[in-house]
Structures are given as C-alpha cells and as structure tokens.
Amino acid sequence: MSHLIYSRKADNTAMTPEQIIARAPAVYADTKAEKLTDRYAQLKTADFIPIMADYGYLPTQAAQRKTRKNNNPEHSSHLLAFAKANDLNGSGGVRSEVLLYNSHDGSSSVRLLAGAFRFVCTNGIVAGEGFNTRLHHTKNSINSFEDLLRSTVEKLPAVLELFEKMRAIKLDQEQKNTLARQAVSLRWNYVDSVYEADQEAGIYADNWSISDALSTKRHQDVGDDFFTVWNRIQENVLRGNVFVKKVTDNHEVRIRKSRPINSVKEHIRVNQGLFDLIEV
C-alpha cells in the first residue's frame, strides 16, 4: 500500500474484487498466521462483503498495512470502506460510510466503524470510540455480524448531523489554534520551542506546525466554520502537510516535512482522535 488516499478509485465509486485484491490482498486470504492456535477462528473479510451488499453497501476503499520482509501480506491488518449504493455521489459533499477493519495474524478483532467521506479533499473520516463495535475471532461469532452492522448503520445519521452542527459554529483564531495544537499532538510531541538545551531527541511539533495544520489547500476549504477548519486540520495532519522539527541525539534541530500516515492502524487511531476533539 502506498498511501491510504490512493486506496480508492479515482471516481470514488464501488470497487471490483480485482481492484480490492490489488490494494488489499488480505481481504481474500484463506489462511491465518501459523502462530495462531485452533482457538482462533479465522473470520474471512471477503465473507462479509456479500452481507454488506445485502444491506445495500458496496466497497469503495481497500487498504492494507505494509508487512516486513518475512511476514505474509495475506495476514496483515487491512481496511475496507463501504458506502450505500444509492449514495455513492453523496449529498452536501459528504457521504456516510461503514468501515471494516480486520487481520488474520491475531493482532486485532474485526471492527466495524462509522465513518464518512468528504469528496472535495477525498478525506476519509473515522468516528470516535462511541461509534464502533468489535467482533472477536471465535467460532460462530460471524453470526453476530449483522447485529453489529445494524448497530453501526444506526449511528451514521448522528455523524452527519454532527457535521451540520459544526457548519453553524464559527471559530475565532484562538479556537482554531487550540484545535490545531490538539490535533498535531495526536501525531507528534508538542512543545512551544525545540531549542531548549535539554530537549530530548525526537520529532516535535511547534507553533509553526499549528500554522501548517490550519493552512488551506483549495478555495473550497476557505472558511471559519468548525467543519471546514476541522477538515483542513484533519487533511494536513493525516497527509503530512505539516513541517515538524527533529531533534538529534546531539541536540541538533532539523526541519522536515512530515510524511503521510501509511499505517492502517495508525490512520484509524489518529482519525478517531481527531473526531473526538469535536465538541458542539
């Protein structure tokens, strides 16, 4: 996987099985990691796709964690996003999605997460902890999947309603700075200045990073409403449009542009953390 934002089709419509396999081969894996015991029941991600289709949801994104050289890529964590067949073009520039996260190496349970997709910036949004459910890898647990799916789908309108409330709230500069500082702190240690003599080695965000997080990439993102500001910050933090500072063991300070998040697990963690910053 090169980058999560490239794990969708260019037109953001439904994906074919061949397109899914090209981006996330673990979705169609038939085996589990050899280290796992018989108590671990493999829940094949591909088996969930027809169930999602029965509820009108089609796959629109497939992403997979990169594996180390000796690890089997068919067992690593992966993500599928699903959207309603009649809502692939969205309304108001945003469509709701159901995200399915799974692995076959024992590193995670099956997770269903409420989410959304914003077309103008191709941002995938993952709702916070109160909007997701888990399914453990045990025998017969797949029978509970539909109950979890219905529970997740019921939460989707609340996500879109929250966005509407955010659009009605205007933020002043101090509020924007506070939100951006909280956001960058989800990825990097935040300090007012890295030029302290006793600063430990590491990657740090500072006031310049806040400015980068708030920066606008397109005219559609110009605005002071909560939703627009939050989306600017989310895009910049997830995609690495933020300059940070690296402090070496010799206390040298080097400025570097951050990288996009390529880990599926980290993408979900930071994305959920950003969602949890929303207070209306």
Write out the residue ranges for each language-model feature:
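Intrinsically disordered, low-complexity regulatory segments
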Residues: 1-43, 54, 71, 274-280
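Intrinsically disordered, low-complexity regions enriched in serine/threonine
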Residues: 1-8, 86-95, 103-280
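Amphipathic, interaction-prone secondary-structure segments
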Residues: 42-111, 267-269, 273-277
